[in-house]
Amino acid sequence: MSKVTTSTLMKFKQEGKKFTALTAYDASFAAAFDSEGVDVLLVGDSLGMVLQGHEDTLPVTVQDIAYHTRCVRRGISRALLIADLPFMSYATVEQTMTTATALMQAGANMVKLEGGEWLLESVKKLTERGVPVCAHIGLTPQSVHVFGGFKVQGRDADNAQRILNEAKALEAAGAQLLVIECIPASLAKAITEALSIPVIGIGAGKDTDGQILVMHDVLGISSGYIPRFSKNYLKQTGEIRAAVRAFIDEVADGSFPGPEHTFN
């Protein structure tokens, strides 16, 4: 299988082909996901919760993400590798450049950052300097205390319009990929149709171009809070690689996410 690039994902969107993404944090799991055909792997700051045992993602450092990015890079040959910029590691344009440099040098193909219009200058500067950007809007976990918890965003008309405007502005600034999290399916569909870049959903209905889940949720090994939008594929398959294939197949045929994983 040929290597996945941002151009590959654009082609998928244009052809209407759904693609898949999973988080990964080490070489062994990354190699398994890569060989089964997962298109995008994310070294997410979710590692703060699922690996380090924190209540949220805020304690994760640039060094943490860089370490796990190097680990994942060694295990893959096909998937596009994205690395999260951790909390407060991109508060200014200059800081964003420094953090992105460290993660790209660790092996990332793209960096992901959370937020809306305040990020536009950073997205523009990264793009101008050859760093591919994935933006993340909707429920942004690094802002969990501002939101008052992990809550669905964009349910009222004003906030829905704000999120749509953010998506358009981030694309115009140069973002090549967008993650939208925990928003109503109708809003996710509107964003996906309004943008020319690929849109990945998590808790955002089935009409996005791609779907991403945390690997621990897919394998049923998460402790504590289990998001409504997740699905334990290991329970129905009994084997890790089969679980990954089931996730890929259900995204491809549109059966995941189902109504039980979707917000209105």
UniProtKB/Swiss-Prot annotation:
Active site per database record: 181
Free-text cofactor note: Binds 1 Mg(2+) ion per subunit.
Principal location class: cytoplasm
UniProt key word Lipid biosynthesis: no
Keywords: Cytoplasm, Magnesium, Metal-binding, Pantothenate biosynthesis, Transferase
Cofactors (names): Mg(2+)
Protein EC: 2.1.2.11
Catalyzed reaction equations: 3-methyl-2-oxobutanoate + (6R)-5,10-methylene-5,6,7,8-tetrahydrofolate + H2O = 2-dehydropantoate + (6S)-5,6,7,8-tetrahydrofolate
Single GO MF descriptor: 3-methyl-2-oxobutanoate hydroxymethyltransferase activity
Subcellular location: Cytoplasm
Source organism, top-level taxon: Bacteria
Top-level EC class as recorded in UniProt: transferase
Pathway assignment: Cofactor biosynthesis; (R)-pantothenate biosynthesis; (R)-pantoate from 3-methyl-2-oxobutanoate: step 1/2
GO cellular component: cytoplasm
Function comment: Catalyzes the reversible reaction in which hydroxymethyl group from 5,10-methylenetetrahydrofolate is transferred onto alpha-ketoisovalerate to form ketopantoate.
Family under the similarity heading: Belongs to the PanB family.
Name of this chain's protein: 3-methyl-2-oxobutanoate hydroxymethyltransferase
Gene: panB
